[in-house]
Amino acid sequence: MRVVVAMSGGVDSSAAAALLKEQGHEVIGITLRVWSYEGKATCGSCCSPDDIDDARAVAQTLGIPFYVANAEEIFQDRVINPFVQSYLGGRTPIPCVACNRDVKFNFLLKRARALGARLATGHYARVEEVDGRFVLRRAVDAAKDQSYFLFTLGQDELRDILFPVGGMTKAEVRAVAERHGLVTSQKPESMEICFVPDGDYAGFVEKVAGPQPAGDIVDTEGNVLGTHQGIHRYTVGQRKGLNLGGGEIRYVHRLEPETQRVVVGPAEGTGRDNFGLLQPHWVDGPPPASQPVEVRIRHRHSGAQGRVHVSPHGLVSVKLDAPARAVTPGQAAVVYDQDRVLGGGWIV
């Protein structure tokens, strides 16, 4: 079988390529160039010139062909621009989902299919075929599971996608890379968004969109408590960085882009047990309203029990059994049935 491996320059995709080569497949390595480096912020893991060099070195060690594909235009259009606009609109985006949906599993999958190949990545997730339908499941290594970022995949994509490391632990993945003598075997992980490696999201937004208008920080009654330098600097549930002096501890309840106000209050005011989902996507159809499900409202969220209701017009609402703290507009809510990903959408 011919397989294109999306090689990020990290240990996971390196091990994925090695495993497929061991299994006798015809493996082709491709790294996506998603960022121009001159005059822009340094790009982090999976994007930088050093990562491209590491991916090339791994391909040479494994004896597989290697190519670099330019995806800068689609990355700018589908990932960078929506990321910035979300922050300016008072939402907290999660660009990795958009990158997976539009870049890795659209742009790159199309190119793999044009070569008569399937596409493999280093994601920690699993795909199984059950009665002719494809099921997306959590990874075996719960601490590394990345299924949350993959809820936009559907039957058409899953039939041609492989996740070779999804059934392994991180230690086992590193052992595979070590056994093959790959330069990435002990490479550290990056926990930040790849195009904002220093974690300064507000600074990145300002580099792209320029200085943003200041506004008031108010309590839930509308009383002015202080000022801020742009709502893009805040997210729902945030406590640090409000600079309101002493007194009671306050948290961000909501952001109002129309008035440029940041509304704050006590911790209990950040909880929500119901919310809607924009642009819902289901891996193989939505769950019935009577079915109990687990809902993860951010990547590191342990999950909350609840139910999902889909109206005849496709509008989706989530009702949790108990309020969850910091349900944040712009983040993804992903719906699970045990280890099976059912789908999800964007919190409003």
Swiss-Prot record:
Entry keyword Nuclease: no
Biological-process GO terms, alphabetical: tRNA wobble position uridine thiolation
Primary localisation category: cytoplasm
Similarity comment: family membership: Belongs to the MnmA/TRMU family.
Protein name according to UniProt: tRNA-specific 2-thiouridylase MnmA
UniProt KW Phosphoprotein keyword: no
Origin organism lineage: Bacteria, Pseudomonadati, Myxococcota, Myxococcia, Myxococcales
Superkingdom of the organism of origin: Bacteria
Active-site positions on this chain: C99, C194
Enzyme Commission number(s) from the entry: 2.8.1.13
